[in-house]
Amino acid sequence: MPEKILGLDIGAGSVKAVLLSRGFFGAHRILGVRRIDIRGPGGVPEALALLFADPVYEGATCVTALPADRISFRNIRLPFRGDRRIRQTLAFALEPLTHQPLNSVFIDYLVSSQDVQSEIFAALADRSLVGEWTELLSPHTRETAVIDVGAAPLAAFLLRKPDSHACTLVLDVGLRDTTAIFTAEGRIRHIRHFHFGGEKATQAVAETLRMDTAAAEALKKAGDIPEPAAASVRAVCDPFLSELKNTQRFLFDQGRIPSEISRIILTGGGALTPGLAERLSRTFAVCVEGTDLITSGNYEMEHALRSSWEPAILDQALALATRPMGKGRGFNFRQRESVTAGFGGLDGFLKKGAA
């Protein structure tokens, strides 16, 4: 019987859900798509209750992701190869580099490059945060199989494509935050969080044109805003672009990316901000692309669902639903996974089987 997988993208402003049936021979059927705004004091729990009130979403295995701004990232080099030796040593190597007690976090990692040595990109998540996420979902899902990080599943999906070896910047622009993922040679090299989102552009339009935020958001989405408002949007975008450019320079100088960015992929609800793609292209002197994962896979879906599909908003949830369950290119902080002794004496600090 085909397995039902629910990709659940929980953002600052809304919950996005894509329900997928994984069949044989790589076929996927999309059974449901929802976007529910997070409003009022009920917050995320209320939005989830509304989602799961629809019986079509019951009994699914859930794949979700922690917000990138709640995760600590570290780059570290180890003088050997091999997953077992990395797992045995990593917690000790990270201890001097973090202000968090290691018995309060889960650690997972990706190998960002490897020859005789291993370049490790590690992520540390508070155990309390992982527990909070698991508790939030446990009343509604059959199992939370994967808890990844931010837009990493979307970047990993794009890395499956044959043109993924170029030095690429994947930008997921949300309501209040942006996750930037730098990839090169088919691997995730770095993840950085920025305090910039589509809400800043909406506020700039509202203040310039002296209208309420709902009207400003509708005008922004229509894409045809008067020049004074467009100038205000550029003014709030430019500090973010400058910070992003400085991050690229730092990563290149540190040898964490092999070259300057040659490709930018822009997604997320805030990616629809008028003028953002053009200013990104001008800042980095590269073309800026959007995402549309539906066109790059074997997906079946009803016409009504297809006609309402918004790639920039829903692609992250789809990437979660299609994420491999086993060890792969993503992080996995699933709390259900048992830990074993033998990780350099720091038993349980580093979870088993980094995904």
PLM-predicted stretches and their roles:
Residues 1-355:
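Hydrophobic/aromatic-enriched cytosolic interaction surfaces used to assemble or bind macromolecules
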